[in-house]
Amino acid sequence: MEKILKPISGFLALLVSLVLIAFSGFLFAAGKNEPLIIACGFVLFFAALFIIKGLMIINPNHSRVLNFFGKYVGTVKNNGLFFVNPLYSTLKVSLRAQNLQGQSLKVNDKMGNPIEIGAVIVWKVGDTYKAVYEVDDYKDYVGKQSEAAVRHLAVSFAYDNLEDEGAEITLRDGGEKV
């Protein structure tokens, strides 16, 4: 089940990390012969790098799925600069509408006549949790499922009602209803 997260703004974390980097540079310059001050500078510098690792940019119509050592934490769907736990791993998932140009399939219709059928399918990810965790490759999954649906559609209806006079909906005349 998808869980939407609202992370904090990344601008404050970016400001804090820049201040830490500047202060660590000051400590490096000020503590030329003082190993304790130089060590503090290193600690501040690596703390700033750790904070920067938690920054993420999400573009419009994209999302990030967050994991914490293999456990699903949530999904961020808002766009902008955000700060999350630096130990989270993230997976990008596009929420944009995508086109799938199905290849032309040779199948038999309901009456047993050979026909050639194809489809152009527009789809987009609705649930990022299912897209990432319930299938291996969701783009390949959509392609295979759409081909199976087109095959099922072709064998469920007659192409034309010349042989089946009782057919109300055909693939040729009832395209909108099919």
Where are these regions (language model features)?
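Hydrophobic alpha-helical transmembrane segments
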Residues: 26-45
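Short Pro/Gly-enriched beta-strand edge/turn motifs at strand-loop
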Residues: 44-48, 99-102
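N-terminal membrane-targeting/pre-transmembrane regions
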Residues: 1-18
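Aromatic-capped interface at the extracytoplasmic side
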Residues: 50-63
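Hydrophobic core of alpha-helical transmembrane segments in multi-pass integral membrane proteins
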Residues: 14-26, 45
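Membrane-cytosol interface motif
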Residues: 63-88
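Membrane-bilayer interface helices and TM-boundary transition segments
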Residues: 61-64, 74, 100, 105
